[in-house]
Amino acid sequence: MVEKTKGRKEEVVTREYTINLHKRLHGCTFKKKAPNAIKEIRKFAQKAMGTKDVRVDVKLNKQIWSRGIRSVPRRVRVRIARKRNDDEDAKEELYSLVTVAKIPAGTLKGLGPQIIEEDDE
């Protein structure tokens, strides 16, 4: 019999992504742009990490709302970490934590997804 190994969605991992909010919020009502941006970031993290439980960091929320409800940044660089849920009575075994990533000098162009080695922050 072949031994079952852990699936790729089961491992704890951290990745950096650039999310193009402009494309995801095109045609959205002005007064709903910032709330919808947060929803789109959650949706992106669910798809990328395969977890239903997504937690958005306060600093990321402040960055999205920094220019008001209408003027959301076109692109945002985020770090998504899939982590184990320590609560015993939690529904999901894993959750995703979305934080702001440090942007290298220059622009966001040409930066693809990157796997981050675990360094205890």
Swiss-Prot record:
The root-end lineage is: Eukaryota, Viridiplantae, Streptophyta, Embryophyta, Tracheophyta
Return one Gene Ontology term, BP aspect.
cytoplasmic translation
Family assignment from sequence similarity: Belongs to the eukaryotic ribosomal protein eL31 family.
A UniProt-annotated Pfam family:
Ribosomal_L31e
Which UniProt keywords are present, listed alphabetically?
A: Ribonucleoprotein, Ribosomal protein
A single Gene Ontology MF term assigned here is:
structural constituent of ribosome
Under SMART domains, the record lists: Ribosomal_L31e (SM01380)
Q: Which InterPro entries match?
A: Ribosomal_eL31, Ribosomal_eL31_CS, Ribosomal_eL31_dom_sf
Q: Which domain of life is it from?
A: Eukaryota
Q: Which organism is it from?
A: Panax ginseng (Korean ginseng)
**Record's protein name:** Large ribosomal subunit protein eL31
Q: Which NCBIfam families match?
A: PRK01192.1-1
TM segments? Answer: none
Which cellular components does GO assign to this protein? cytosolic large ribosomal subunit
